[in-house]
Amino acid sequence: RDVAPSRGLGDVYKRQLLFSVLNVIQLVGWTAIMIYDGSLSVNSILNMGDTGRWIACIVIGALIVLWILVGISNLGKLNTIAMAALFILTIVMCFFIFGNGNGMGAAGDDSMSFGAAVELSVAMPLSWLPLISDYTREAEKPFKATLASTLVYGAVSCWMYIIGMSASILTGESDIAKIMLKSGLSIAGLVIVILSTVTTTFLDAYSAGISSESIFSKLKGKYVAVAVTIVGVIAAIVYPMDDITDFLYLIGSVFAPMIAIQIADFFILKKDRASKAVDICNIIVWPVSYTHLRAHETELHL
């Protein structure tokens, strides 16, 4: 159900170790990417030049660390205020986008096939499956908590895709900061960018800390999360991350097969593999099937 530790169970530890390590790697990557994208948007809105971008990285990182140190159990009111503000501002943006029918229209191109776009879009929510379970694993009613999380996440994700596509068509821009500026949401846009970046990236960093505990039980997840945030800030300052296509393919190659095999085994084949430390057959199927898909992508017109 999740990648959190089950201490004393050697086989369980072996099974979860590989995906725990991969999960930490992808969460560190997401932390850096989110901070990088957030800093670009903040700097674009405030127009502070080259220095402004790394200052924005540090400020966003500091806010994420604050969220982590406050602790998930004490974030109730803070998260409620942040989410309410973000929700209201997003609705304001929706009214502007859908109330304005005079958009310029963004020209399409053939830089990415429809299938590739779908695959990369699916890779993101699939990579969040281990993250979601880090927050639902201790729920009093795990099934209801997981179902509610999945439905809400899916609905909001579709909403965000619609907003992004519509805003891009309206303004002729793909840069979220420029879209917000053209939408007349300069200050409100700044608040949206900062709140969405901090609240989302907090989840990445915190989950990386939780997953690290399943690799080394003596580690404290909160402090690992802080370290992950610091690494993310440094990476966001040093490395350009404008094109994350390869990163999305990487996590897609891990988490799409993982959940596909899990669903097929548990719900369709009804196989109980709890007694096995590692299922060699599934491990082999994983890279072979994904390599085959990538090799025949053009033939399938995806």
PLM regions: where:
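Transmembrane helix-loop boundary segments of multi-pass membrane transporters
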Residues: G10-K14, S41-A56, S73-A82, I176-A188, ...
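Membrane-water interface regions at transmembrane-helix termini and the short interhelical loops
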Residues: D37-N47, G61-A82, N100, D134-E140, ...
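C-terminal membrane-solvent junction of multi-pass transporters and transport-like membrane proteins
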Residues: I261-L302
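Hydrophobic transmembrane alpha-helices that form the core helical bundles
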Residues: Q16-M48, V198-S214
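Single conserved hydrophobic/aromatic residue that forms the stacking wall/gate
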Residues: D2-L9, Y13, H292, E299-H301
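Transmembrane alpha-helical segments of multi-pass small-molecule transport proteins
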Residues: L17-V24, I45-V70, A84-C94, F114-P130, ...
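Hydrophobic, membrane-embedded alpha-helices of multi-pass small-molecule transporters
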Residues: F96-N100, G108-I169, L181-F202, A277-Y290
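Membrane-interface loop-to-helix entry segments
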Residues: I55, V59, I64-I97, G108-D109, ...
